[in-house]
């Protein structure tokens, strides 16, 4: 943490860990959530705060620093990279990926017309088909009571458990500890006024959901799912369409951050993207710099080997041909 007198002006939450005998400093996280961000108070200059953070990190001379989900174009992180270079630190950027942003503005027709013709036609067909079969509506839940939070989060869990994720063992209800984690996280968001739940309703019954946090006019999408038995109605597509229409009407100026890797379905709605990735740093010490150098050289080789394995035909298919 960085203080200016009695005022906290910046920080970077990290935890000590160890992997393959290598000492690491990294953001707190688990398999369901990345946490920890490079923070600088909006009322102060970025460079001195970040320089102080880098100076403090340099005291951990035996550790490699590993940051996931870094949004590289933001001023704190671009400054962080410059400060690492200034102290002759070594670093590497890995797993660079794109994340989609959707900014509808206050003119739904203009936004919808900006999408590809094929996508617009697909959305219209899906909505027409769904409305022919039943009553279609969208439920936006904000300012929930504690009891309602539990009720509706559990409804979301049940919907997801009726998808392919249940058989894969990756749904929330199929993962030990995951329901309580998301319920606790939702409670933190609720008490901070940030919790939003969206449900696609068919004849007043929810068939798809999106679990979001809203802060500073950015709606962050953390979990989305739908009941597999309604797959023929394209519930994910309809949820997104009705959600964006609602945001345009009720909350103009809100930006939807789709989080996660930009897949083809997200890209069809996106108006812009940003890059995230892993930043690995060795500031001081011979051993961390040697470890980082070895890691940066080995990672592409391992990745190429995995790609070859994943694209190689099996012996059975080779014999059949």
Which ranges hold each PLM region?
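Membrane-proximal basic amphipathic "stem/tether" segments
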Residues: 280-321
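Acyl-donor binding region in acyl/amide transferases
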Residues: 17-95, 213-275, 280
């Amino acid at each position: 943490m960085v203080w200016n007198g009695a005022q906290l002006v910046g920080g970077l939450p990290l935890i000590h860990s160890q992997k393959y005998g290598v000492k690491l400093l990294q953001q707190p996280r688990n398999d369901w959530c990345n946490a920890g961000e490079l923070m600088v108070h909006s009322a102060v200059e970025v460079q001195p705060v970040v320089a102080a953070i880098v100076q403090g990190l340099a005291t951990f001379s035996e550790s490699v620093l590993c940051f996931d989900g870094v949004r590289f174009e933001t001023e704190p992180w671009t400054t962080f990279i410059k400060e690492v270079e200034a102290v002759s630190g070594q670093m590497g950027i890995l797993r660079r990926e794109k994340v989609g942003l959707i900014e509808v503005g206050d003119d739904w027709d203009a936004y919808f017309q900006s999408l590809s013709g094929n996508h617009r036609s697909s959305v219209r067909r899906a909505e027409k088909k769904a409305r022919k079969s039943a009553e279609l509506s969208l439920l936006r839940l904000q300012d929930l009571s504690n009891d309602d939070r539990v009720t509706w989060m559990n409804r979301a869990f049940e919907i997801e458990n009726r998808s392919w994720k249940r058989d894969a063992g990756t749904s929330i209800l199929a993962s030990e500890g995951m329901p309580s984690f998301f319920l606790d996280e939702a409670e933190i968001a609720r008490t901070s006024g940030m919790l939003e739940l969206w449900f696609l309703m068919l004849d007043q019954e929810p068939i798809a959901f999106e679990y979001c946090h809203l802060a500073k006019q950015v709606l962050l999408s953390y979990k989305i799912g739908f009941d597999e038995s309604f797959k023929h109605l394209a519930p994910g597509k309809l949820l997104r369409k009705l959600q964006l229409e609602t945001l345009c009407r009720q909350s103009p100026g809100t930006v939807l951050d789709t989080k996660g890797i930009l897949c083809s379905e997200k890209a069809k709605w996106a108006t812009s993207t940003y890059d995230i990735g892993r930043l690995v740093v060795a500031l001081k010490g011979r051993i961390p710099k040697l470890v980082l150098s070895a890691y940066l050289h080995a990672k592409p080789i391992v990745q190429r080997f995995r790609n070859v394995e994943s694209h190689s035909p099996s012996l059975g298919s080779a014999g059949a041909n």
